[in-house]
Amino acid sequence: MGKANKRKKIMLISPMLHQGGFERICVMTARLLQKEYDVVIAVFSLEDVAYDISGLQVIDLKLKARKGKLNKGINVFRRSYRLTRLQRELDIDVSYSFGMTANIANALTTGARRKLTACHSFEEIKDAVYMKLISRHSDRVFCCSKKMADLVQKDYGFTNVQALWNPCDIEGIQKQSRVAEGEDLSFWETEDKVLVSMGREDDVKGFWHLLKAFRRINEKMPDTRLAIIGDGEFREYKELAQRLGIADRVLFAGLKRNPFPYLQKSDLYLLTSLSEGLPNALVEALALSLPIVSVNCLSGPAEILHENWREAEAKKEVFEADYGILTPAVKPVKNMQTDMEEEEEQLASAASKLLGDPELYESYQKAAASRAADFSKETYYRELASCIEEMTK
């Protein structure tokens, strides 16, 4: 094979492949790229793999996380050294990393022709030392939302930053939503309307706001239920639901390897996060034509739910966006008392209005699928492949 026709070699780097948004993106990226490129995934640990990696080349560096500042520092250099050796052995053209620890290790490697790093959370870009490190040592820094890329360019003056939306397997989601064998859907099999939210037990998800807003929705519309799908015990949230008098209307469903049959049977998606990068769950809801009410947090909801994201982001009141309803951002202080805050009332009012307005509800249902296509894996692949080709001419 002539050199001009040689398949380029791509190394994807992720800390692990367990439950997590960027790990899922890493695996999906590998499957998309392997059609045109030789792809290898390097991970620091192969423990607790949650994704299908059959048919993919995965190398376990066996350098999992360690406790203590000294051990963590040593780990950074051990990982970078091992990755550099591997890049040289495999003659890697482009290394592309996901997550903070992988980005740091990748930035410090010297074995690939080009280096790409990816930021997937708003909290990540607030770390100035980290951002300076990866920007100075990367050929391109991807941010998963336009708002994040905008902030990085403005706050740090970096010019090698590009927005690259997370890929969503639209057809796969729709197909999986029809595979309900073995799933317990009894909570959904009533005449009640089911409101749903997804996310692990983490303060950044703002689930106390969700429960209090739902209490108000249920007061107005007693035929409503709430399901929270995600990993965690949710002990303090179950206690809050008891104090709010809604425990019999709320299901903490736990982690679901296939959450899509549950989304498919739901009536409304709610998001109450304090911050996001680009919330994949909103795109997944759109893919299943599920109407959305989301707080207008940094970042992601505004640009998912409205064409002119800058216009939507600037709104300080309830806003009926192109593809869903945005409500004011919630307060970051964790308040586990039963008193209601203004933003919770606004979220509850918007959700109640949408559920009670068949014309508005149907308009969002019809618009959802076309918007989800903008976040398809095909769109992601085209943009990523274009970047790789540009950098490796």
Per-segment meaning from a language model:
Residues L12-G20, R24-I74:
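N-terminal strand-loop element at the rim of the active site
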Residues Q87, T110, R114-K146:
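A conserved, positively charged/aromatic
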Residues P291-V295, G300, I304-H306, R310-V318:
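Short hydrophobic beta-strand element within catalytic cores of glycosyltransferases
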Residues K353, L360-D374:
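A short, well-ordered alpha-helix in the C-terminal region of glycosyltransferases
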